[in-house]
């Protein structure tokens, strides 16, 4: 049971490294959906994650279907600017639940068919019209800490 960050085919190694570092510091699991837009030996990935990689609970999946089969009872939430509800309107407070926050590629987001099939589980982070999107690692941190806040920051000081 816990909180899971899922990156669907991430492209920018520094974003993934920053997210991995946040996961290491919070006990949140990280799932990477292949294909990745970089090598896991990438210098920028390693640099962004610093020397915390041994503390990251990281999982690799060949596709979203593989993730869904591995965690059939997961409580999946899809982060997209097309979400009709904001992240703060969702309840992530049950520590016995597995919450999966699924993020799309930095350039394209999530596949439209996935969004359309899960509109009731799509959430957004409010922003003004001056930008197309927020940075992926910042967005992941917002969701990660909102779920942790709702659960009383378990095992964190």
Task: Locate predicted features.
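Post-transcriptional modification and biogenesis factors for structured RNAs
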Residues: 1-157
């Amino acid at each position: 049971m816990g909180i899971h960050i899922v990156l669907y085919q991430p492209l920018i190694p520094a974003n993934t490294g920053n997210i991995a570092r946040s996961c290491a510091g919070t006990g949140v699991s990280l799932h990477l959906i292949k294909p990745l837009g970089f090598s896991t030996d990438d210098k920028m990935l390693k640099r962004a994650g610093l020397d915390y990689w041994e503390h990251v609970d990281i999982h690799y999946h060949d596709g979203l279907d593989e993730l869904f089969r591995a965690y059939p009872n997961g409580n999946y939430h899809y982060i997209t600017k097309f979400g009709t509800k904001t992240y703060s309107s969702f309840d992530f407070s049950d520590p016995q639940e597995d919450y999966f926050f699924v993020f799309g590629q930095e350039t394209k987001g999530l596949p439209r068919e996935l969004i359309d099939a899960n509109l009731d589980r799509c959430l957004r982070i409010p922003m003004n019209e001056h930008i197309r999107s927020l940075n992926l690692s910042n967005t992941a941190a917002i969701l990660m800490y909102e779920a942790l806040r709702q659960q009383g920051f378990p095992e964190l000081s």
